[in-house]
Amino acid sequence: LKRQTFDSSGQEVFFKYDGILYQKRLNLIGGFQAENVLMAAALVISLGSEPQDVFNVLHNLMTVRGRMELAASRANGASVFVDYAHTPDAIETAIKSLRPHVFGRIIAVIGAGGDRDQSKRPLMGLAASQNADVVIVTDDNPRSEDPAKIRQMIIKDLSRDAIHEYGDRAEAI
């Protein structure tokens, strides 16, 4: 992988194979996607497929549901993505992966499931607040726990400037 250029719906990737420089379109969000795609392409080629055949279908690849998935496009041009990140590292990676594709603010809507590891909740909030421009904290399957307490655990150590809290997930979104 030599270079990538990003836009709101994907990326152009520039890579070398067998001494030839290729430029191909990936309709996938996140720089890491190019690395994954090229690794998969190398495996397919190593199993006997023709490189040109493999490279010519890269633009047809689609993301896995719930992973950097384009869910909607707003009338104002904003894109809405879904990623089921559920750890601090995954939230940080997801938001950072979006940044090159975004020409305005990133608004992250996050929550934490109930009856799960409570120690990661403040870290999830911190990861979101350090990487997004605005963070909206909402409920995400609280199970047997009090949803308000889960939200408070996520936001307890955060500056309130760009943090919003909504118990109703639909309202938050």
Roles of regions detected by a PLM:
Residues 1-4, 79, 173:
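Short, solvent-exposed polar/charged micro-motifs at secondary-structure junctions
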Residues 124-173:
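C-terminal helical cap/extension that packs against the catalytic core
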Residues 4-12:
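A short, compositionally biased
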Residues 15-17, 155:
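Short, positively charged
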Residues 3, 83, 138:
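Conserved phosphate-donor/acceptor-positioning beta-strand/loop module used by diverse small-molecule
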